[in-house]
Amino acid sequence: MTDMVEPMKPNDMPTDLQSAFELQRAAFAQQPHSQWPERRDRLQRLRRLVSDNEEEIERTIDADFGGRPAIETQIAEVYPSLAEINGALRSGERWMRPERVWVSKWFLPARAEIQPRPLGVVGVIVPWNYPLYLAIGPMVGALVAGNRTLVKMSEYTPAFSALFKRLVEKYFAPEEAAVVTGDATVAQAFSELPFDHLLFTGSTAVGRRVMAAAAANLTPVTLELGGKSPTVVAPEYPVQRAATRILAGKLLNAGQTCVAPDYVLLPREMIKPFVREARAQARRMFPAGLGNRDFCAVVNQRHYQ
């Protein structure tokens, strides 16, 4: 997601975005408490969306990155997405059950329970680094809980964003789930909609702006933000094993992962052996260097710099 712009005036809100939101909000008002068979059906359709179109998904993500091996997309996005859906299908009906909770003796013989209820329309802002998984994961949570969901895809993955929009339109009615695409202007307008919950994955700087925009509507926000991820190597830990494991995490997706190791903390006397082993491990993993098709490309020049 790019830097966000000035808040929009009500009349400046993109018509299709506003219409998509209003459609879902009206649908939820008419049917606020969906039953498990309906939720299960939506999850099953989401699973088919991924499994039936896996090869095309891998090709479009490869095109957006300018080179990302299919096996990496499978391991990091396709399989985790299917696992999320299958987990919700296994447990979703149980999650809907009321939960009895303790009541103080001063309130006896009263009884109390927690009753799970849908929120309404859930907004999801998806980043570019794992565009499939970071769209599917939040959608699973929204749909299994009985919500409607509106998803804003990243402008940095235009081919996949267009494909995902087309697939969601194929497998879902617009009042169930919908996708919007566009630049920072659309992202700003999206954040200003009065969602019942908003989920954002991206940078800390943009996360602040998303939360500020949502605050005008008192929209609850879940932020999953980037940061620095240190790795610590204990004095007694084998250097070669440490280098192998750290490089595996760092080089996955060319390091374009929010939890990819950023730096290593280790005893001074282990620095040179670690650097030597890390270089050797990188050569073993990618012997052709940048010419190796198994190494993911950086998504664009801006992020490379």
Describe each PLM feature range.
Residues 2-113:
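N-terminal Rossmann-like NAD(P)+-binding subdomain of aldehyde/semialdehyde dehydrogenases
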